[in-house]
Swiss-Prot record:
Belongs to the RimM family. The PRC barrel domain binds ribosomal protein uS19. Residues 98-177 form the PRC barrel domain. It is found in: Cytoplasm. It comes from Photobacterium profundum (strain SS9). InterPro entries: PRC-brl_dom, PRC_barrel-like_sf, RimM, RimM_N, RimM_N_sf, Transl_B-barrel_sf. This is Ribosome maturation factor RimM. It comes from the Bacteria. The gene is rimM. Keywords: Chaperone, Cytoplasm, Ribosome biogenesis, rRNA processing. GO terms for molecular function: ribosome binding. One of its GO terms (biological process) is ribosomal small subunit biogenesis. Coiled coil: none annotated.
Length: 177
């Protein structure tokens, strides 16, 4: 990804075409699914390149949503966007307070125990329903033989601090798990 694209945040994905007038199904990754339409323009990844496109209209359809993108007036024109990712520039996202952060900020951060043991780096975050879970890829020569750790994201109980500047998360966690 070029440095110009590093500030992009994927907020959804386009699905199959809907009808004959160029509408597409929309799958939102935003917390409130409809808020994906508050961001303009969308950047759509087609053949490896991000292209800006405006939303002409959108509506709920059954359990999901569909959108009409500017310049797509027939089904055949819209088909090229089937399964394409939808991104926006990171600076379009709402500002957060000092204690809040976006999950994307955690990726790549080092995870260290309160005793100073380096557990590895965050590679993914799982949503489990009760609480989110950090997926931490262990260092190659992990003293405990771990390749990956799943650490529950329980603020104060497990997660002791997050330092954006140092790119570090301090946890109260047994390195043997």
């Amino acid at each position: 990804m070029s440095s110009q694209n590093q500030d992009l945040v994927v907020v959804g994905k386009l699905g199959a075409t809907y009808g004959i007038k160029g509408w597409l199904k929309v799958f939102s990754y935003t917390e409130q699914s409809e808020s994906i339409f508050a961001y303009q323009p969308w950047l759509i990844k087609v053949k490896g390149e991000w292209k800006p496109i405006q939303i002409e209209s959108w509506k709920k359809h059954g359990q999901g949503m569909v959108a009409k993108l500017e310049g797509l007036d027939i089904r055949e024109d819209a088909q090229i966007f089937t399964n394409a990712e939808v991104a926006v520039h990171a600076d379009q996202l709402p500002a957060l307070s000092g204690e809040e952060f976006y999950w994307r900020e955690l990726y790549g951060m080092s995870v260290v125990t309160t005793e100073g043991y380096d557990l590895g780096k965050v590679t993914d975050i799982l949503e489990t329903g009760s609480n989110d879970v950090l997926v931490v890829k262990a260092n190659l020569k992990d003293a405990f033989g771990q390749k990956e750790r799943l650490i529950p994201f329980l603020d104060e109980q497990v997660i002791k601090s997050i330092d954006r500047t140092a790119q570090r998360i301090e946890v109260d966690w047994d390195p043997g798990f």
